[in-house]
Design a protein with these regions (language model features):
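Rossmann-fold scaffold of SDR-type NAD(P)-dependent oxidoreductases
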Residues: 18, 85-94, 135
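N-terminal Rossmann NAD(P)H-binding glycine-rich loop of SDR-like oxidoreductase domains
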Residues: 13-35
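Conserved residues in the N-terminal Rossmann fold of short-chain dehydrogenase/reductase
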Residues: 44, 71-72, 112
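NAD(P)-dependent short-chain dehydrogenase/reductase
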Residues: 147-148, 153-208
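Conserved Rossmann-fold NAD(P)-dependent oxidoreductase catalytic core, especially the SDR/UDP-sugar
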Residues: 93, 97-157, 161, 172
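Conserved Rossmann-fold cofactor-binding substructure of NAD(P)-dependent oxidoreductases
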Residues: 63-90
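A short, basic/flexible loop-to-alpha-helix module at the beginning of a structural domain
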Residues: 1-13
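Conserved glycine-rich Rossmann-like NAD(P)H-binding loop of the short-chain dehydrogenase/reductase
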Residues: 36-52
Length: 208
């Protein structure tokens, strides 16, 4: 009863998931497919991942696959975000560069996606009257020691500043949520360990 009640707020609503082909997007999509939600929009850069997701939905969830619409774009480009944002009620802002080594080698790329890109999503959501935006952060944003964590911490500051700027009673509510390592997600340690064991290699463990 509690689960059905909690999902009732999404009845006949439109949900946008930026970075929707990632680990989070896939999990959320499965959760919402069986609800009374009107439409789920998947926004991402990778047409191959979108095509794979589309075929998977048609094969596994044929009766509800039509609820899912796909938008190719980049959060760094607000114009493409605006197109996907039209008519949206709720947003999960999950588009990010999250691989720690990649962010270390290319910190400006991490900043452009995680900070500027998220700001574009927030601006677009506010302009289009979206009810709620949930910005996905990470536990690495607490006392950050690497570029990924720093970019996510700054992203949180941007979201908090936007919420403060809107003030209480605004049409759009912005919130951030932090979560830790997700088991078997892309870039997580478990797939690496499995691969190393299958190849008979030593398991690598780091000490911060």
């Amino acid at each position: 009863e509690e689960i059905r009640y909690s999902m009732s707020v999404f009845k006949d609503k439109i949900l946008l998931i930026t970075g929707g082909t990632g680990s989070f997007g896939n999990a959320v999509l499965r959760r919402f497919l069986r609800s009374d939600i009107k439409e789920i929009r998947i926004f991402s850069r990778d047409e191959k991942k979108q095509d794979d997701m589309r075929h998977h939905l048609q094969a596994q969830y044929p009766e509800v696959a039509s609820k899912v619409k796909f938008y190719i774009g980049n959060v760094r480009e607000k114009q493409s975000v605006d197109i996907a944002m039209r008519g949206v009620d709720y947003v999960f802002s999950a588009a990010a560069l999250k691989q720690v080594p990649s962010c270390e080698f290319f910190p400006m790329e991490a900043t452009m996606t995680n900070v500027v890109g998220t700001n574009n999503v927030l601006l677009s959501a506010i302009e289009h009257g979206v009810k709620n935006v949930v910005v996905l952060s990470t536990d690495k944003a607490a006392y950050p020691i690497n570029a990924m964590g720093i970019s996510k911490a700054l992203m949180e500051k941007v979201a908090i500043a936007k919420g403060r700027e809107l003030g209480s009673g605004a049409a759009t509510t912005i919130c951030c949520t932090r979560y830790g390592n997700v088991m078997c997600s892309r870039g997580s340690v478990i797939p690496l360990w499995v691969e190393q064991m299958e190849q008979g290699k030593p398991i690598t463990i780091t000490d911060p």
